[in-house]
Amino acid sequence: MAVVAPTAREENVYMAKLADRAESDEEMVEFMEKVSNSLGSEELTVEERNLLSVAYKNVIGARRASWRIISSIEQKEESRGNEEHVNSIREYRSKIENELSKICDGILKLLDSKLIPSATSGDSKVFYLKMKGDYHRYLAEFKTGAERKEAAESTLTAYKAAQDIASAELAPTHPIRLGLALNFSVFYYEILNSPDRACNLAKQAFDEAIAELDTLGEESYKDSTLIMQLLRDNLTLWTSDMQDDGADEIKEDPKPEEKN
């Protein structure tokens, strides 16, 4: 029996998985971009969608962490009056910000040109619109002035569009709907400095999911309850922060592989 050669799409998906195992995040992004760009009007499978999300989350996550560390060092050196060090740090921070901008621009372009227009199901529409909101939010984390305002407005627009579809088409316990609520509430808290709205959104999502927990299927039970726990963690943190100035880590929607 003749062996059927894998298609270019299958080969790129396999190579993306290989790059993931090898922790070669940039290459993983490249392979999944090839898959996305080769589809025409066809949609990515759930597996492909998750691989793309993981690839970009790994690449952006490392640089977001670097930016936070460097910004913290910059503040300390500024308070000590070490101008020479501050100038060097600013140059380095600027380099990281350029990399962050490039990564965000890359995935946002792919989302607008391919992924969002070809999405047909409710969960894929919400998935990609949430992703669009996430990457505009990452831009808002470090941009300033008019650029920050623009990034924040784009985040809000994408999250609201995703929320409208999620409310109409996805169950309150659906992990994608819960992940959207988690990240949307983080946006209100961190970018818009609106703890009340952040807490209200997170609490509503948590309460609605709790009310329907008995209808949750076995396959998404683990994913959904994990995100519900993260919503509760943030609510606990934010309500205590309103009373004192805590500095614990705010939780965001984990990568698909972290839910397993």
Curated annotation (Swiss-Prot):
Top-level taxon in the UniProt lineage: Eukaryota
Q: Which GO terms describe its cellular component?
A: cytoplasm
Pfam families, per the entry: 14-3-3
Record-linked InterPro entries: 14-3-3, 14-3-3_CS, 14-3-3_dom_sf, 14-3-3_domain
Which Gene3D superfamilies does this UniProt record tie to the protein?
14-3-3 domain (1.20.190.20)
UniProt record, GO biological process = protein localization; signal transduction
Which PANTHER family does the protein's record reference? 14-3-3 PROTEIN
State how it assembles.
Answer: Homodimer.
The family this protein is said to belong to: Belongs to the 14-3-3 family.
* Record protein name field: 14-3-3 protein 3
Look up and give the organism this protein is from.
Answer: Solanum lycopersicum
